Amino acid sequence: MVLDISEIRTAWQDSDFITDCLCWHNVYRQRHAAPPLTMSSELCHLAQTWANHLAHTNRFYYRNDRDIGQNLFCRPSNGLVQEVTGQEVATYWYSAVRQYDYGKEPDCLHANVNAGHFTQIVWVSTRYCGVGKARSRSGKVVVVAHYMPPGNISGSYMENVLPPCEEYPRVAPPPRLILPASSVTTGSSRTTSPST
């Protein structure tokens, strides 16, 4: 049986990958005194639809939608079937922390190129997250995360991207979270730059 990748749907409530990714987002947010994110079924659906599109078309680019924050991850196929974990993806995005300068309001164009994945993860005013994952016919894995309200807003970095706390728990998150679905409207009048 051949399954058309554009028809794959993920129920986030049953996805260990999605709950693991959310959990690690919240571990990193806690390090920066940001409140925990809540998973949104609407954002999961949008992220899964976009991940399916990218995998099906074998392309890799951000949605043209300034009303949501976005992070993308891609692992090309190396001939072996390799699964990615939510921890691996969130850690990859967070690793851009090394590029961020807490001492000044960054130039949005340069900040997003260097640290946009990180800043979106820890953006204090972001409250909701949705994640989708798809595999292309060639085996490439694409992961998409969408955030509401979006981060990486020019002029708002200083109050939304806080330095790491002196002390934070260094315990691994639980392997699986069961979270209630949430509904988030996607209307926003703030202008953002796509994060990379």
Where do the model's predicted regions map?
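A solvent-exposed, acidic/Ser-Thr-rich amphipathic alpha-helical stretch
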Residues: 61-90
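Generic structural "secondary-structure junction" signal
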Residues: 39, 62, 70, 74, ...
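Generic short alpha-helical segment signal, independent of protein family or function
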Residues: 52-55, 77, 94, 98
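Disordered inhibitory propeptide/activation segment of secreted metzincin zinc metalloprotease zymogens
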Residues: 1-3
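General secretory precursor processing signal
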Residues: 24-26, 77, 111, 168
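Short, well-ordered surface patches within globular domains
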Residues: 6-69
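Disulfide-stabilized extracellular recognition modules
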Residues: 82-190, 194-196
